[in-house]
Amino acid sequence: MAKFLNTSATNYFLEELIKGAQERLVLISPFLKLNDRIKELLEDKNRLKIDVRIVYGKSELQPQEIEWLKAQSYIRTSFCKNLHAKCYLNEENAIVTSLNLYEFSQINNNEMGILIRRDDDAELYKDTYEEAQRIIRISDEVRISMERVSSTDSET
């Protein structure tokens, strides 16, 4: 049976979901500005070569997000226009929530969500997983790149 999550529980179970990923991790959020704790957890998944897919919907990624993502070889990013869904899942659990992967939201907003455990509610988990896969399919995979431009022209 699904479990209701308030703001603090949503943040807690999101961290647990990321930590618990053994094979794959899908993070779907319109806004993407990761806090240091989430980055640390994702870096660990990257080191373990876990397949991580992040789908976001607002194209204005900050330069520090771009640099960080470029350094993570097992984290793939996709852009999905008109994305409003927020869904986070691994092979065992899914969270459907109002919480964006946005540092401000995780600290300042009142959020809620639902935790779905595959073992407890296989059909609901399957439906959530399939919709997440559909969103991934309609998204454009983005190869993160950023070119540094010198603030002054170099003289020759």
Describe the residue ranges of each PLM region.
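PLD/PLD-like phosphodiesterase catalytic module centered on the HKD motif
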Residues: 1-156
